[in-house]
């Protein structure tokens, strides 16, 4: 028998869905499509019409249950590439996350959601609330169909609660760990898998090609699911589409380490590309932000310098002859014909050197600022190898 709380939660969800079903027409257009009435910003996600749901496999240090991936976030990409972030400061919540429990539990009475967030939406450094606040401020404020103006009877913080509820509801529909295990892909300190095996296992359940990210040990690190969406995101009419990002994983030899296992006896080292039997640490992390010495800001996913917003997470993989290859969500990172650091799906894998926490290319560890695009807080500046004629700095790794 359903508990009183369960019945109440079901009624709330039903009323909310009915409210938005009546607000948005049945023939609401699909995001990234020009068919239908695309003028209603409360019933059409635009221009960020590609919806991503992303999950982590944090095995060392371990985060979340041993038999589950954990939540990263929901966010939207532009249909033409790139993504919005921190779209409306007036909608942001306290960056420490100090108000989230009060919103979810005290204001909206959803202790179950809050408990599940603490179980499955975990920060690797243990600061869950700050992580959740960051994700809402960066991504939740960019979902135009979640804007308070779209609610017929808006209650304060309702969009915040709905964002966290939507994230967890979609997570429940994407049991990545169970899908992999059912296909014979199980956490192991010795077994490896092919990219085709992993992609096929997930595609057979999801219905479209999924993005797989690997760390520098060639171990599964993250999984991204891509959608278009019909109508308001609150209606949850998600339409799976193939990934628009290029994997950084090898075609074979991909590892799926059990959580809590360092993998030191079986995983490839980050510095030499060889196998170690010890537990000694290596100097290049699996993932990192890239900062500029003496400057605020950091590099974003296309390789440009940005003074506001959030730093991109870069992945570091063993290259040839002890070098390191770098990737971002945009693809491989390399040096273009103008000696600029760049990352894209069309960039070839490039060998960099990482020494003392700094990044170099062909022995040159000095970098300079180049051309600027945009203006003000949205300005992006290219970063290029120093030729000795400019004020140089180092590109350094940071967590």
Curated annotation (Swiss-Prot):
The keyword Cytoplasm applies. The keyword Lyase applies. It is found in: Vacuole lumen; Cytoplasm. The active site is at 72, 135, 139. Its EC number is 4.6.1.19. InterPro entries: Ribonuclease_T2_eukaryotic (IPR033697), RNase_T2-like (IPR001568), RNase_T2-like_sf (IPR036430), RNase_T2_His_AS_2 (IPR033130). It holds the Pfam family RNaseT2L_C. It comes from the Eukaryota. GO terms for molecular function: ribonuclease T2 activity; RNA binding; RNA endonuclease activity. Glycans are attached at residue 291. Residues 259-279 are annotated as: Disordered. Its main location: other. Keywords: Cytoplasm, Disulfide bond, Endonuclease, Glycoprotein, Hydrolase, Lyase, Nuclease, Signal, Vacuole. GO terms for biological process: RNA catabolic process. One of its GO terms (cellular component) is vacuolar lumen. Disulfide bonds join 24-43, 32-79, 42-150, 87-142, 214-249. Residues 262-279 have a biased composition (Low complexity). Residues 1-17 form the signal peptide. SUPFAM superfamilies: Ribonuclease Rh-like (SSF55895). It catalyses: a ribonucleotidyl-ribonucleotide-RNA + H2O = a 3'-end 3'-phospho-ribonucleotide-RNA + a 5'-end dephospho-ribonucleoside-RNA + H(+). Belongs to the RNase T2 family. Rnase which modulates cell survival under stress conditions. Released from the vacuole to the cytoplasm during stress to promote tRNA and rRNA cleavage and to activate separately a downstream pathway that promotes cell death. Involved in cell size, vacuolar morphology and growth at high temperatures and high salt concentration. PANTHER family: RIBONUCLEASE T2. This is Ribonuclease T2-like 1-A. It comes from Candida albicans (strain SC5314 / ATCC MYA-2876) (Yeast).
């Amino acid at each position: 028998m359903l508990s009183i709380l369960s019945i109440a939660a079901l009624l709330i969800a039903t009323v909310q869905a009915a409210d938005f079903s009546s607000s948005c027409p049945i023939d609401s257009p699909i995001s990234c499509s020009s068919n239908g009435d695309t003028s209603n910003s409360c019933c059409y996600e635009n221009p960020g019409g590609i919806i991503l749901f992303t999950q982590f496999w944090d095995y060392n240090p371990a985060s979340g249950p041993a038999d589950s991936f954990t939540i990263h976030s929901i966010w939207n990409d532009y249909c033409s590439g790139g993504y919005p972030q921190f779209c409306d400061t007036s909608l942001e919540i306290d960056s420490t996350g100090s108000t989230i429990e009060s919103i979810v539990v005290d204001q909206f009475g959803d202790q179950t959601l809050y408990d599940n967030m603490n179980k499955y939406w975990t920060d690797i450094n243990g600061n869950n609330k700050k992580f959740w606040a960051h994700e809402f401020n960066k991504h939740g404020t960019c979902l135009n169909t979640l804007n308070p103006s779209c609610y017929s009877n808006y209650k304060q913080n309702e969009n915040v609660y709905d964002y966290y509820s939507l994230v967890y509801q979609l997570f429940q529909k994407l049991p990545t760990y169970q899908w992999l295990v059912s296909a014979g892909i199980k956490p192991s300190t010795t077994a490896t898998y092919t990219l085709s095996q992993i992609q096929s296992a997930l595609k057979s359940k999801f219905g479209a090609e999924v993005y797989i990210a690997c760390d520098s040990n060639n171990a599964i690190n993250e999984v991204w699911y891509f959608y278009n969406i019909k109508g308001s995101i609150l209606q949850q009419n998600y339409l799976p589409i193939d990934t628009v990002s290029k994997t950084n994983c090898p075609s074979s030899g991909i590892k799926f380490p059990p959580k809590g296992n360092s993998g030191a006896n079986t995983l490839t080292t980050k510095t030499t590309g060889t196998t170690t039997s010890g537990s000694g640490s290596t100097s290049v992390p699996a993932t990192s932000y890239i900062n500029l010495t003496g400057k605020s800001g950091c590099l974003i996913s296309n390789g440009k310098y940005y003074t506001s917003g959030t730093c991109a997470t870069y992945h570091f993989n063993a290259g040839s002859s002890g070098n390191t290859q770098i990737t971002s969500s945009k693809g491989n990172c390399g040096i273009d014909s103008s000696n600029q650091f760049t990352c894209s799906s069309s960039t070839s894998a490039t060998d960099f050197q990482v020494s003392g926490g700094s990044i170099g290319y062909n022995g040159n560890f000095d970098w300079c600022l180049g051309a600027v695009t945009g203006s003000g807080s949205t300005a992006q500046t290219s970063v290029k190898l120093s030729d000795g004629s400019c004020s140089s700095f180092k590109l350094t790794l940071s967590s």
